[in-house]
């Protein structure tokens, strides 16, 4: 007999998930509130914009993305935030998630479909099939000059203020601007 078989492990996993799912609305509300307070502390820093949200009501608030005029400013801001003790900050291009050239199955054109869709479809025969870094220069530029700051699910007001002030000061510091 395999470990866990006959031990109702599926029921245990379901019971734990059921309890965790009930907590989800509070966790999301807290992250949204933390993100809103941090954005309020930041105000409207010159030369920096917030990522446009196409569905603000659907944003759960797990991170804050700031967009700079150039890659150097983003890099310097991450360095300054790290120097100030903020560890959960990255240039978006280095974060790794959900960026086309980091999705191996997309770059390699590996399909879940046995038919190889969409790459093997006759309708796509004329399409350019390159998803390596550099295939989308406008997106690449955006990724390179954006930073992502993760928002933990249970920040206290003191932590929100400290993070907000560190970001505000780092964005406004001469080292981040030049």
Report each predicted region and the residues it spans.
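PLP-dependent aminotransferase class I/II
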Residues: 1-178
